[in-house]
């Protein structure tokens, strides 16, 4: 079973002949939400687990729960949002905000690292473990939205695709009071 943060190959629940590769951002029993394009996670282990395992600057308190904001961004700097994708009514609202949900038993919540250009659990729900195929070793083939081959990604390991981000910018994310 995938752990939080793992990159996973799975069969698309709406069409089992299609394979997807996404990051498991929440597992059974976790609470997950999106606020202003930021992933929020309240692990099933609870508040003490959050305090013991995540940096204080990434934790916000809402009611009686501690939430981790963008829990994988520092460890996996390839996770990013596109600053050109804005909430102007033309883009899907799920990119920007999603009310908290509990991930059901035997399921996981998947998100692509290219957050604003990913067809993932925000749009079609959690993925049952029966659809999990495994972990990717390398990129066999890759193309963009225009069906152009991305030669710079072909035959690269998943780890080599991680790119550097400005960690100071991540620290400056303003946390608003409350999730919804």
Q: What is each of the regions a protein language model found here?
A:
Residues 1-180:
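Soluble "head" domains of membrane/secretory-pathway proteins
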